[in-house]
């Protein structure tokens, strides 16, 4: 019996971690106009990786109503706001699914000390609202985000993320 439970747990974990969110997050980063400091190639690659991971984490947290995916990708105000969103969803029984995410990101400010980068993200995706797992609403959305990322020990973290009407 315990072997069956173990196999089921592994299959469930595998399906949750491979559920479409990660593969559906596409990010294009243009850092050519960042100032006053230019973004080094390796830094650009790491920011691209970590920003994609952040959106994968948002999608998983809001779809499965769990705070775990927010660890490591977010800090400060951004983590607090996302945690409140997940907690609110847990109370209401609703969840959100982000499908076919496409992010066109432009680095506009990179601090001379290299301790903060400002990104402008035009995000496009299908937003699905679910009630107890049942789809109740779906719409195609385009949202503009201003994002501040700061370096941590081994990655860049989203410190602030705010939707704005336009850049």
Residue ranges with predicted function:
Residues 38-41, 67-114:
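Short solvent-exposed beta->alpha transition segments
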Residues 47-48, 94-97, 113, 134-137:
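Intrinsically disordered, low-complexity segments enriched in polar/charged residues with Gly/Pro
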Residues 55, 78, 125-127:
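Residue-level detector of secondary-structure transition/capping positions
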Residues 112-167:
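Exposed beta-sheet edge and beta->alpha loop/turn motif
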């Amino acid at each position: 019996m315990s072997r069956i439970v173990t196999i089921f747990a592994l299959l469930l974990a595998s399906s949750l971690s491979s559920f479409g969110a990660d593969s559906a997050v596409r990010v294009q980063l243009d850092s050519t106009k960042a100032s006053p400091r230019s973004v080094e190639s390796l830094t650009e690659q790491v920011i691209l990786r970590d920003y994609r991971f952040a959106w994968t984490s948002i999608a998983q947290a809001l779809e499965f109503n769990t705070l775990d995916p927010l660890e490591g990708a977010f800090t400060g105000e951004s983590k607090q706001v996302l945690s409140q969103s997940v907690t609110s969803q847990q109370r209401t029984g609703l969840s959100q699914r982000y499908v076919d995410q496409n992010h066109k990101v432009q680095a506009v400010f990179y601090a001379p000390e290299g301790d903060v980068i400002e990104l402008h993200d035009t995000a496009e995706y299908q937003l699905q609202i679910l009630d107890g797992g049942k789809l109740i609403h779906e719409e195609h959305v385009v949202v503009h985000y201003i994002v501040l990322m700061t370096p941590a020990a081994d990655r860049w973290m989203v410190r602030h993320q705010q939707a704005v009407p336009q850049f």
